[in-house]
Each structure stands twice: as structure tokens, then as C-alpha cells.
Amino acid sequence: MLRSELTRDQLGHLAVQYAKAMGMRVIAIDGGDAKADLCKKLGAEEYLDYTKTKDLAAEVTRITTYGAHAVIVFAASREAYASGPGFLRPGGTLVAVGLPKETDIIAGAPPLMLALKRLQIVGSVTGTLKVRCISYATYAEVVR
């Protein structure tokens, strides 16, 4: 799995394992029953199927009480960026990883929501700190 290019799914699967190894509670959002089984096997505490769940934000809030501390968007889609901020608790952070073809996508939080909930939106480029990543993955038994 440690190739020069990882697919969106593989990146998400690694993220679930890293987050779990770091003691975080993971809610995975994807589509399909096969993904549910895999995400839970990799360490996700909860799995939400976006093709079946009518109100994802309400479900995330129900599970977390106030919303997620952080949302990492791996999907390269408008919908993922539009819905991500709605999953966050006050002071939460959205991390942009998936890079859509469209260059004009803006995370879907109105400025008032950004200000009142004190949300942060940050970008992340994967592929840096490779040695540290591999070292941590081996130590935490993420990659077996």
C-alpha cells in the first residue's frame, strides 16, 4: 500500500488507522455496505453511508453530541466540501486533502457559520515527511 500514488479510498483507510492508533474516535463516511465492513475493521467506531443516511450532519451530531472536532475531506467532490463544515463542533477544523477537478470549490460554510462557530479550514498536501509517516505506521502497527 505504500506506493507513490494512493487512491482516495486507500488514503482514507490509512487515515482511519492512524486516527485510531492515536486514540481518536473515528466516524467514517462513505458509500456501500462493503465499505462499512472495511472501515469498521480498520478501526472506525461508526460508519455512515451517505447513500442511505438522509441527514449526515444530524447523525454526526447525534454520535458526538456537539459535532466532530475535525473533518478530513478525502473525496474530491463538491458535495464533500459542501457538507463537511456542517459536521463540525464549535472550534472544529476541516482539513482539505481531496483535490477536485474544479478549482472554485469553497467549503460550504457561510461566513456567519465560520465566524460564530469559530471554524478553521486548512489544507494539507500528502506525501511529505515520508520517513516519519512510515516510521509511525510501523510503530503503531498501522501497516502490517
Regions found by a protein language model. Give the residues of each.
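Aromatic/hydrophobic pocket-lining residues that form π-stacking "cages" and hydrophobic walls in ligand
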Residues: 11, 15, 35, 60, ...
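Glycine-rich phosphate-binding loop and adjacent beta-alpha segment
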Residues: 22, 33, 77-144
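Short amphipathic alpha-helix with an adjacent loop that forms part of the alpha/beta core around
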Residues: 53-65
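N-terminal Rossmann-like NAD(P) cofactor-binding module of classical short-chain dehydrogenase/reductase
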Residues: 69-72, 95
